[in-house]
Amino acid sequence: MSNPQPEKVRVVVGDDHPLFREGVVRALSLSGSVNVVGEADDGAAALELIKAHLPDVALLDYRMPGMDGAQVAAAVRSYELPTRVLLISAHDEPAIVYQALQQGAAGFLLKDSTRTEIVKAVLDCAKGRDVVAPSLVGGLAGEIRQRAAPVAPVLSAREREVLNRIACGQSIPAIAAELYVAPSTVKTHVQRLYEKLGVSDRAAAVAEAMRQRLLD
């Protein structure tokens, strides 16, 4: 009794460059593990094929006419379709890769990947693994760190003057007299400082200002 053949991974391929698309389709088909169920030359057509066939993986060019690959990934996620979208591009900018993954892509490859690497990435993606080209990992990590870093609040010149005087322990009337403004104006500046620093009292404001090096 022969063992049953493993089910092939069903794939839709979308790319507006016919020669590249045909080469990828041929490589996937010759792998013996993939069944290409549809081809598209623009994003909207790729999305319709995905909705019609519900493939395991959609291998899409990042830049296509109409909808780009990341927009298709976002649509697939919004429709709650089971297909995992794997993008491929000649562009390696970390911001593009990060945004594409945020929009719902399960992976990102470069077009200089070998056919063997593309086939492996498709199979890995079908197994639920997130796939990113090795040469993109360092840049992507840097992009994530940069976006995760807290952004220092933007303070006006007057807010900085008030903040520095608060740090010196001056009272609101004293600050008002020194800056030639009404105490109510100083109170408004203090409240805005609390909001920008994410605090609710003087001590916390000074501590946060010191942490973020906002004091002169």
UniProtKB/Swiss-Prot annotation:
One cellular-component annotation, GO: cytoplasm
Domain HTH luxR-type: 148-213
Any one GO biological process: regulation of DNA-templated transcription
Organism: Mycobacterium tuberculosis (strain ATCC 25618 / H37Rv)
Lineage: Bacteria, Bacillati, Actinomycetota, Actinomycetes, Mycobacteriales
UniProt miscellaneous comment: Was identified as a high-confidence drug target.
Recorded GO MF terms: DNA binding
DNA-binding interval(s): 172-191
Chain's role: Member of the two-component regulatory system NarS/NarL that regulates genes involved in aerobic nitrate metabolism. Upon phosphorylation by NarS, functions as a transcription regulator by direct binding to promoter regions of target genes together with DevR to regulate their expression during aerobic nitrate metabolism.
Residues with PTM 4-aspartylphosphate: D61
Pfam families: GerE, Response_reg
Record localization: Cytoplasm
This protein's name: Probable transcriptional regulatory protein NarL
Keyword Transcription regulation (UniProt): yes
InterPro entries given in the database record: CheY-like_superfamily, Sig_transdc_resp-reg_C-effctor, Sig_transdc_resp-reg_receiver, Tscrpt_reg_LuxR_C, WalR-like
Phenotype of gene-disrupted mutants: Mutants show no change in virulence in mouse model of infection.
Keywords per UniProt: Cytoplasm, DNA-binding, Phosphoprotein, Transcription, Transcription regulation, Two-component regulatory system
Subunit composition and interactions: Monomer in solution. Interacts with DevR.
